[in-house]
Amino acid sequence: MTVAPQSQTPLTGEDISRRVLKLIGSLKSNADLTVEHLEQQTGLSMRRAADGGSFGTGAAIDSNWSYNLLVGPVLGEKKNQLTFDFDRTGDQNAPMTPVCALDFDDYARALKDMGFQDSAVRAEHNRISYWNFQGPVSLRVYVEGESNESPEKIAHSCVKTITVE
């Protein structure tokens, strides 16, 4: 589902990150992934897809970045999945700096303060593929280095995508 940008004052990466963390903290179960609950917790208007089973919102942050917040059914299951992501819409090599004011460490600290337990899921060469956070709902958090400008920026983990079930 592609969501048309909302016509309002653009949110910053930090603004939308704080709203998503507030939303995650409010979820008691997968049943809370409803239009009404997301609108109440994020302050954003959701749009329903033509099929009626999916909904979401999204908007530009700047000329290179946008965010998407989408909910849809999990195939073969009676539950929904929320996907939040920062999407490069301009320069495909743009640094994540505009969407990394709250970095992975900030997200992880906030999620742990909410009672979530974390574990890294590793891929080949012991590289972290994503982070699992278990609580009232299950999260997968995918990260990316802030930029290729320096070893420090490469190692600085920014949140790229979060899925919630």
What are these regions (language model features)?
Residues 1-77:
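N-terminal leader/targeting segments
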Residues 36, 41, 45-47, 70-72, ...:
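A structural detector for beta-sheet-dominated domains
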Residues 1, 99-101, 157-159:
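Sequence contexts marking disulfide-bonded cysteines in secreted/extracellular proteins
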Residues 52-61, 84, 128-133:
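Generic recognition of long tandem-repeat/solenoid scaffolds
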Residues 14-27, 62-63, 108-112, 135-148:
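Mature, folded catalytic cores of secreted/periplasmic enzymes
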Residues 126-165:
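Glycine-rich, aromatic-bearing surface loops/beta-hairpins
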